[in-house]
């Protein structure tokens, strides 16, 4: 089973990168590929740009990567209560290649933040919009106060309750 894990941030030190990678490796027998949002850099989407530039290679490559997956894990960073600009822009361009961005594949949405909110707002946005992008949502989990529950030196969750929720 091939698992595609994506952290929806451009930060190389993203806590959502750590969470997506950790969660993907919990799938027994899974082959994991972690996608870097920076590999799909695109100009700001607009209809005018789409008319002049057409479908861009990075958006097509993103759709093609998701086609390879048997399951997808997306860990969402929250900026001002919603998606990061880079992730929203990628969704906008990718949805022009194929409205069915997630291609009816099983998707788990995760979100975390350093604070007690756990990026719950962006998680709600993702789950609510998932049907529009043809995601077969199998679960979602917000993890508040990430640094209180994750050991950076071992790259492991230290909270057994949260770990159990992820495994489910």
Predicted regions and their residues:
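N-terminal beta1-alpha1-beta2 submodule of the flavodoxin-like/Rossmannoid cofactor-binding fold
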Residues: 1-92, 96, 153-168
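Short, glycine-/small-residue-rich phosphate/pyrophosphate-handling segment
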Residues: 103-145
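A charged, well-structured terminal subsegment
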Residues: 130-168
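Phenylalanine-focused residue identity feature
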Residues: 40, 62, 87, 109, ...
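A glycine- and small-aliphatic-rich helix-loop capping segment at beta-alpha/alpha-beta transitions
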Residues: 89-99, 127-132
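Residue-level detector of flexible, active-site-proximal loop/helix-junction positions
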Residues: 10, 39-41, 114, 144-147
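Amphipathic alpha-helical interaction elements
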Residues: 8-12, 99, 115, 135
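Short glycine- and Lys/Arg-enriched binding-loop motifs that mark or flank ligand-binding interfaces
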Residues: 4, 77, 100, 111-114
């Amino acid at each position: 089973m091939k698992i595609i894990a994506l952290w929806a941030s451009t930060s190389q030190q993203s806590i959502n990168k750590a969470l997506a990678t950790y969660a993907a490796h919990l799938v027994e027998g899974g082959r994991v590929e972690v996608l870097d949002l920076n590999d799909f850099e695109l100009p700001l989407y607009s209809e005018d740009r789409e008319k002049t530039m057409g479908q861009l290679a990075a958006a097509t490559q993103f759709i093609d990567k998701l086609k390879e997956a048997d399951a997808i894990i997306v860990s969402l960073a929250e900026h001002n209560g919603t998606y990061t600009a880079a992730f929203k822009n990628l969704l906008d361009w990718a949805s022009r290649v194929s409205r069915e961005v997630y291609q009816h594949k099983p998707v788990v949405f995760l979100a975390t933040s350093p604070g007690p909110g756990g990026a719950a707002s962006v998680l709600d946005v993702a789950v609510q919009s998932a049907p529009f992008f043809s995601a077969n949502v199998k679960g979602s989990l917000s993890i508040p106060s990430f640094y209180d529950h994750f050991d950076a030196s071992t790259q492991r969750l230290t909270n057994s309750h949260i770990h159990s929720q992820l495994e489910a």
